Curated annotation (Swiss-Prot):
Species in which this protein is naturally found: Pseudomonas entomophila (strain L48)
Protein name, UniProt field: Protoheme IX farnesyltransferase 1
One GO biological process term: heme O biosynthetic process
Pfam families: UbiA
Coiled coil regions, renumbered to chain: none
EC number: 2.5.1.141
Family of this protein: Belongs to the UbiA prenyltransferase family. Protoheme IX farnesyltransferase subfamily.
TM region positions: 25-45, 47-67, 95-115, 119-139, 147-167, 173-193, 217-237, 243-263, 279-299
Localization, UniProt: Cell inner membrane
Function per UniProt: Converts heme B (protoheme IX) to heme O by substitution of the vinyl group on carbon 2 of heme B porphyrin ring with a hydroxyethyl farnesyl side group.
CDD domains recorded: PT_UbiA_Cox10 (cd13957)
Keyword annotations from UniProtKB, A to Z: Cell inner membrane, Cell membrane, Heme biosynthesis, Membrane, Transferase, Transmembrane, Transmembrane helix
Annotated membrane topology: Multi-pass membrane protein
Protein's pathway: Porphyrin-containing compound metabolism; heme O biosynthesis; heme O from protoheme: step 1/1
Amino acid sequence: MATLLSTERPRTGWRDYMELTKPKVVVLMLITSLVGMFLATRAGVAWSVLLFGNLGIGLCAGGAAVVNHVVDRRIDALMARTHKRPLAQGRVAPLPALAFALLLAVMGLALLLAFTNTLTAWLTLASLLGYAVLYTGFLKRATPQNIVIGGLAGAAPPLLGWVAVSGHVSAEPLLLVLIIFAWTPPHFWALAIHRKAEYEKADIPMLPVTHGEHYTALHILLYTLILLAVSLLPYAIHMSGPLYLACALALGLRFLHWAWVLYRGTRPHAAIKTFKYSIGYLFALFIALLVDHYLLLNL
């Protein structure tokens, strides 16, 4: 009886499937998508586009996250940060997880086709495939520049939100994509330094594993400088006003401070503190864009 119980697959619950979608990551993506929608127009955003457009983008992002869990299940089982994930622990089997991912993606694309436009659906599909297939299936295990090349897929949500409202691609949403693209390397490399031993154990060629922590910290510092410069471009092209400029400078200089601390190696736990700050940074920067947009409209 004891042997039977020990070999039994753990029970699967709805929370396991919810965890597979990486809801915290999806929420941050949807914030940038929402901002993209509101920045695309001087009028209000139609409630159907706002609700179903973001739901469609979120479902597709969740589907891509599920594929990531399936492909990475053996790696996840080796890492302290991820070993309790549903697939790593066997609470969800790979085939049901893939079926769930397909269902989410189909539902998401159907909503985008029904309530936004064809271009949004195509761009969302490209983003989904870029993350689930190109990054997860190939780049993550192939090169220490994995998150630089694959980061474009994760940077797409503000473009998707903008196109859902406007129906076309323009320079402004591409600039928002560029901000997230520049933000991605310092964000993930800071975590990779903190979790270097785990990535090494799982044989993932993250930059700290292949080139060392000091080299990685230098590149975090350089990318943070690039991010600071790029984050000022919305003001430079008159997309935003003085409020955004002040917020971008304050947030960016604080990010630069943490990148410098990490590079100097003078404080313990600087890597994880830099990683955590980067999350708040992106959230605050996009909220500043949104608030500034409506202030400009009322002037």
